[in-house]
Amino acid sequence: MAVKIRLTRMGSKKKPFYRINVADSRAPRDGRFIETVGTYNPLVAENQVTLKEDRVLDWLGKGAQPSDTVRSLLSKAGVMAKFHDQKFSK
């Protein structure tokens, strides 16, 4: 089963709000998911992102592939650097 970390759209029309979910790559965008690991609100001036860093690092360690947008959000939050350090420090 190929697992992806990607955004799921929530909110109302013209007011998007996203959950960062771990899901099977074959599932629909707003469909079935395995776990919610964070949120992203693009409407706030500083683009508010909340993450469960330990769970994100766990899923990345298990081989989950982040989407391009999620990879960008994780990089800005410093999670990808931590994952890289963990992976190559052994």
Swiss-Prot record:
UniProt keyword Ribosomal protein present: yes
The keyword Transcription regulation is annotated on this UniProt entry: no
GO process annotations (BP): translation
Gene Ontology terms for molecular function: structural constituent of ribosome
UniProt keyword annotations, A-Z: Ribonucleoprotein, Ribosomal protein
Domain of life, source organism: Bacteria
PANTHER family the UniProt entry points to: 30S RIBOSOMAL PROTEIN S16 (PTHR12919), SMALL RIBOSOMAL SUBUNIT PROTEIN BS16M (PTHR12919:SF20)
Name listed for the protein in its UniProt record: Small ribosomal subunit protein bS16
Organism whose genome encodes this protein: Streptococcus equi subsp. equi (strain 4047)
